[in-house]
């Protein structure tokens, strides 16, 4: 049972404890601890120590129990709150369709799940850091063991705070040194903590070894580059969101150049390390046989490891959600069943095809036809039959892949690719007016994709490149937040094929197809009608058991 992170007092140090999940870890790793019954605190004190380096690392690895459940859940906010994805997961009242239609509220499950697990991961990281500090002082762990464990804990804590502030704005900040779990902090405080943790991690962690499941010095540098880009684009304050909360108006874009310079600096540290590279084949970045740098090409920089539903805290359902019911599109005598997440309409494929028909990434990003390896039958995923399939969720890396991975959910989730580092550098340079300098990192991505290079990319080209390179990789709404174009980008659905009220008259549909595209139409209309300025933030949710967390709500909710 996970605890309400808000309903505890602060006495110098924040002393939250998890119960079942954490106590299981502590009972193995700690010299002094107790296993408590469900719902009772398990108090870690300054006297707790671990016995050795391996136990210290094991203690920190427990934080992943709060990251694994989020691997696919992030998509249900970050991708659904965009013009690219819709959800037919369960009834229309379920959390997936609710987010798809911009109808999320404080008790919408994905908001509850992500917010609470990120903070619970922070709690666990805080406790681990305290315990390992004690252990170093007691001579139980070596300096190398301390560096590896605390470096990882601070890396994961910083990543959690970055996700939280991107999605919820000013959030409470608390560490092993103290803080409040209910008092929201200004961005200077939040980003200051993120940067402190990441600079500590950079100094503590070892160089990238080729195993992206292990946080590295270069992974910390990449997150610093990401953080400075996000902060450099001046996230909207609560007051700024309140001013537009109930309107369909995007605020004016602004930036802070000094932070963008820091984004370039940290991107260059990754690039100049010589440890990372772009994979030669974009399509072989995704899938069980390609996960976590199995091909040794060093593009995967940081990943969340998964072994599957029965082995993880939760498997990675990115495949399951985009390819829930393989080949059930009504053709060849198969049933017609809707996946949990769907491409918003044919247009997400069509617009890309029209602009760059030879882009090698398109064929992997959206599938418009697939052959069933068991029957040899070809299935169409394009209207009037269906919408395109998010190809990065269809694991084709091994035999009969289309039918296997959805039951395993064991593919590691990619959090950072080297491609992101290159694009961060290119974007920061363009925002600073140094467009010609941006061409070199920008064109590396385009050369791999097999499309034309440019002498000086524009900001619009940078934005499109994020879509081309990172569709379905959990960047969509976060980029709209940075660029202050959330409302205008979502309202582009008005140009989509099945948005207009006369959509049915333009094609011939079977009954199943008509029912499917009726839902597509309804979701596109809802996106257009419902998106508001308040959606630059997610609602502060309840706790995992429905309790009030005591944190001030975001404007408009």
Positions of PLM-derived features:
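C-terminal motif of bacterial Sec signal peptides marking the signal peptidase cleavage site
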Residues: 29-32
